[in-house]
Amino acid sequence: YTGNPYLIEYPDNVMRAKFETTYNLLKEKFGIEVKSHRAGRWAMDDRYFALLKDFGIEADCSHTPGVSWSQAAGETIMGSDYSKVQNYPSFINNILEIPMTIRKTHISRKGSFKHKLRVLLQGDNVWLRPASATADEMLHLCKCIDTEPNVDYLEFMVHSSELMPNGSPYFKDENAIEELYKTIEAVFAYVRQLGYKGITMAEYCRIYKNNN
């Protein structure tokens, strides 16, 4: 193991202190109660869910269905394995886990012929995330999920650093950022046509509890 440590690698007291520092900073800066959470580098365990409960967190979105981080090294462990987790919400220690929108598809409009053939035969995970999927792939993903009976949400992800030129490895200049915003606008326009509307994780959690 040669990577930076995951939060779940630390002893309970250190883990709590680190989380509390971030929690208090966000609460102070935004002036609201923090009710939703995503783990850094997607690493969760039972202790982490218990910690979220202690701080009044209601919703988490750290699970990545069909994706294993077991090749992503921490300092003493590898990353979490979500390859077998369900792709619809469920409660874990009274925290509503709202998995990231990811599905395996067999269509690819980018890459080499060899890559497209592999995706056609084996499938490939497509995220509702511009850093890892094209606009066409995300539109196709949304269309497919809209027909699923157990899922009534789409979870879109973008890091704030990805919204500025060279803030991330994915969008390095002004042109890339312009294309990113066009992609986001296209995806949002399409899902509005499907009947979706933008809400926070905490708002979705309240709706889910009322309906279940």
Where is each model-derived feature located?
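Metal-dependent polysaccharide deacetylase catalytic core of the NodB/CE4 family, i.e.
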Residues: 1-43
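Alpha-helical scaffolding segments of alpha/beta enzyme cores, especially the outer helices
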Residues: 17, 21-24, 47, 54, ...
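Charged, low-complexity C-terminal accessory regions
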Residues: 29, 34, 103-108, 212
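Short loop/turn motifs at secondary-structure junctions
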Residues: 32-33, 56-58, 150-152, 195
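Extracellular structured ligand-interaction cores
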Residues: 34, 93-95, 153
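Hydrophobic residues within beta-strands of alpha/beta enzymes
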Residues: 37, 60, 154-156
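Active-site-adjacent pocket scaffolds in enzyme catalytic domains
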Residues: 39-149
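C-terminal domain-boundary segment and adjacent tail
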Residues: 123-212
